Amino acid sequence: MEDKSKQCLQDPMCLGIESKHYIGSHGRHQVDFLEEMVDPGEISLDSLIFQRPEDEVSYQKKGGGPASSDNNELEKVLDSILDTSSSSHLHPWDDYVIPEFQEISVTSASSTKTLGDLTTDKKEAGVWTGTTAVENKSIPSLVPKEQDTLEYSIEGQLEGKGRRHGVLASRHPTLPPDGKMPMLPGSAVYLPGQPRHIEEDNDNYDQKHLSPYPCHSSCSHHDGKIKQEDSLYAEYGMPSSNPATPGPDPSLEYICKSETAAAYDNFRSTLGKSSDKAIPVLPTSSTTSQNLYQPLSLNDHQQNAYQSGTVNDAFVPQMHLSYEQYSRPDDPDQSSQYGFDALPRKICLICSDEASGCHYGALTCGSCKVFFKRAIEGQHNYLCAGRNDCIGDKIRRKNCPSCRLKKCCQAGMVLGGRKFKKYNRLKPGRELDRIATSSPMECQQALTRRVSNSSAQEVQYFPELLQILQSIEPEVLYAGYDYTKPETPSALLCSLNQLCERQLLCVVKWSKSLPGFRNMHIDDQIILLQYSWMSLMVFAMGWRSYKHVSGQMLYFAPDLVLNERRMKDSSFYSLCIAMRQLPQEFVKLQISQEEFLCMKALLLLNTIPLEGLKSQSYFDEMRSNYIRELAKAISLRHKGVVASSQRFYHLTKVLDSMHELVKQLHLYCLNTFLQSRALSVEFPEMMTEVISAQLPKILAGMAKPLIFHKK
């Protein structure tokens, strides 16, 4: 046997076969084999990856394998080489192995490592083709003479199921022809695709083989058939490939699936065809091997053998395209489907958590929805331990229920209010667009239907916010007037100043509880109070005069009511007549309590500095909200668009008339303050501060009154 092998090694015609199928006993002639092998410098790992399918196909046509007389000898040689009891062949292999092969380790069947463990090594060693079951203990086919190949076999411990073979091919590094690029894992061209389902024959064994090479499954591994799935192509808008028509290799469809249809079609059109156009490759800076495949399930068993590999950039024709081709298109259809604007983020208006929809009239999360419902139905009297400005974010929303409930009311949440659809199902403006494009008669009917529906719903919507305004309404204070002393103009003014001092404290407390007021800048809050304190107190006095004495007298306090005689005896009779017109107007219009509360809140926001406020935008929004609340309060008792509009006009005219009345009161108050010593009139400390700070500026025209109707 040794003579035959040596004689064949000297024959140039037999050199190719003998160098690939080494014959010896216990690895004695591996040194001779490596000495006769091709120059190791001409072998690279990249050349090991590529296999020429035409060579394997042509080899199968030749009949596969050497003469039958050598089969027994080759089988003995393989048994002697892979004999685990003897390690004589391992030492020469480790000594004379090519440096490029040192990173590839081979373990025996008794070792605990598997081929999957070897291939998942982080080093870029090569690509294992996996394991396959060989039927009827067939001996592996010899590689044709045209290839310089090293083949080794690992004897498995599967009794009656043949042997498991691993093939590691080595050739000269030659560039594959155009259009014949094998589809390999690890290349930057490909993106990880979804694993395909494997259809297996009942005659096959449990362990199947999946090769990453496009041609490998058709050449030697007929036991794994790829199942075509049309649904995967339908997701990308591409028709399923027809196996009857010639085209690219079908294994491409199981190896990878590109992210975009354009790139996928480019690869499919160029694969397997000679083309001068280079295959576009996405730019990448990755140098490490990546596992591009997920575990496949074969026969309901988990397959843990991952396949990975890298390829040299020299073997992949690259064309670095501009990043504009990979950017999001400007097409509105595509941008709405794949862009971020198609997925708007929904934020809770109360705690900034992710909102689940519109609950009780506001976009909130489920937690704030349940909290508001329980707080309103339970009628809890929450008190804030701080200054009514606690932070109510997602983490600290449960710390202060009082501030959380206040934010719910500020956001417009009302129990029993209008139920909106889910936020992600809303189609804003769709109904209005349909109304705008309809006929005039249909437009009028639709608007009438919308107004009637909204009126019926607002009857249930508004009272909950009114409940807040009613709860923060100050109590009626007593003046403490002493009727035992003789009534003089100075004594009356001193009693009114003491009453205004206490009422001013109530106004400050009321404004701090008013929804939305504390969210403004602190300087804006002070300025608004200094501008509106007089109008707020006079307006409240007019409401008491309307409710208690039907507008015939001035009801400053339960113990201080000025009738016609006492008005004439006072030093400000003309002002009393002007102030009495306010409750008389209330009697004429029959102002409801809901309307009064909304109008009073608007009086706080009725005058601003000429230069504006620091939080002017928020002030404008808050004022607009209370104007809308006034319109809702009007709709409670006045149905129809015409009646509501007329009612709104009259009420806003009353608010505009307050500017002239308050201006007269400011002028009289400032003159009395300047002559307080001569008139023997006392002014409390807070009254003194407010009058001296802002009244001169207001009378000098440095304040801007906000009016609804121009004169």
UniProtKB/Swiss-Prot annotation:
Chain positions of all zinc fingers (NR C4-type): 348-368, 384-408
Residue ranges annotated for the NR LBD domain, each copy included: 457-691
Cleavable signal peptide: none
Entry's Gene Ontology cellular component terms: nucleus
SMART domains xref list: HOLI, ZnF_C4
DNA-binding region(s), chain positions: 348-420
Entry note about domains: Composed of three domains: a modulating N-terminal domain, a DNA-binding domain and a C-terminal ligand-binding domain.
Protein purpose: The steroid hormones and their receptors are involved in the regulation of eukaryotic gene expression and affect cellular proliferation and differentiation in target tissues.
Compartments where found: Nucleus
Protein name in the entry: Progesterone receptor
Species, as recorded: Rana dybowskii (Dybovsky's frog)
Expression by tissue: Expressed in all tissues examined: highly expressed in testis and brain. Also expressed in heart, lung, liver, kidney, stomach and small intestine.
Record's keyword terms, sorted: DNA-binding, Lipid-binding, Metal-binding, Nucleus, Receptor, Steroid-binding, Transcription, Transcription regulation, Zinc, Zinc-finger
UniProt family annotation: Belongs to the nuclear hormone receptor family. NR3 subfamily.
